[in-house]
Amino acid sequence: MSASPLKVAVTGAAGQIGYSLLFRLASGSLLGPDRPIELRLLEIEPALKALEGVVMELDDCAFPLLSGVEIGADPNKIFDGANLALLVGARPRGPGMERSDLLEANGAIFTAQGKALNEVAADDIRVGVTGNPANTNALIAMSNAPDIPRERFSALTRLDHNRAISQLAKKTGAKVTDIKKMTIWGNHSATQYPDIFHAEVKGKNAAEVVGDQNWIENDFIPTVAKRGAAIIDARGASSAASAASATTDAARDWLLGTPAGDWVSMAVISDGSYGVPEGLISSFPVTTKDGDWTIVQGLEIDEFSRSRIDKTTAELADERNAVTQLGLI
């Protein structure tokens, strides 16, 4: 365990997702049992007292890999030297708030954080955005960090990806480990397109194994796309532990690489692949190696999939237009 600690910054660290995430990171779920981690935790001033309590719990776990913890409300201080930033904190949608209000409220947060990352983060920084609306929040942060390569920003669609794998496993009676090449296209919203037409169940085409277009269209896709709302209805609170788990999965695969013969879903900046407008942060199938991602190329997109991809990317374009008009990018 001689390697220098990976400096991991987490925003919204005292929140529900943060509470699940920090213990996963400190226990070695991110980089395994040999790489120590230093946590740098950002919160708003009113939440710092609660965050102190979380740090007390982290101390009480005596995690061998946790080399240190720093907390604060100043992003320029907390992001200093960070190798990985997980932007979890975001303004939730309150009663009577329009989506444009939400974009504006979060715009201020992610503008400031993008600027701070640009100034003080380590040269090898990778930035994962979990706080919603994640795709557009990532776009805002990226646009305010001109010195950081644009491919270093990603928004979380791994939770949708994991949800889709789980639903497909349940339908086919397979194990989750039997399922490969799941894809989420587009926005982390109800318009997202979970695509099983390229996925495999035990090496066989998933759509053919299912053999039921009606299930795909009217059961599978809406269940995955609206899973967050279903959890709120059941639990009385939004999904936190599963979001933390997916945040860890996404960061681990980004840093350590995807397994051979498989890919993952990440929302990354579009280069125009699959007709997704250039410059949008949209979910694609990607492979990763040495901390870099590559969009999987050459997949055939049928008419059904095309219409779904177009719908979700149109929503992303609308969000980009809205934040452009607000002067956030």
Curated annotation (Swiss-Prot):
Substrate binds at R93, R99, N132, R163. Pfam families: Ldh_1_C, Ldh_1_N. InterPro entries: L-lactate/malate_DH (IPR001557), Lactate/malate_DH_C (IPR022383), Lactate/malate_DH_N (IPR001236), Lactate_DH/Glyco_Ohase_4_C (IPR015955), Malate_DH_AS (IPR001252), Malate_DH_type2 (IPR010945), NAD(P)-bd_dom_sf (IPR036291). Its EC number is 1.1.1.37. CDD domains: MDH_chloroplast-like. It comes from the Bacteria. It is an enzyme of class 1 (oxidoreductase). The keyword Transferase does not apply. Keywords: NAD, Oxidoreductase, Tricarboxylic acid cycle. GO terms for molecular function: L-malate dehydrogenase (NAD+) activity. NAD(+) binds at G12, A13, A14, G15, Q16, I17, G18, N106, Q113, T130, G131, N132. The active site is at H188. Catalyzes the reversible oxidation of malate to oxaloacetate. Belongs to the LDH/MDH superfamily. MDH type 2 family. This is Malate dehydrogenase. It comes from Mycolicibacterium paratuberculosis (strain ATCC BAA-968 / K-10).
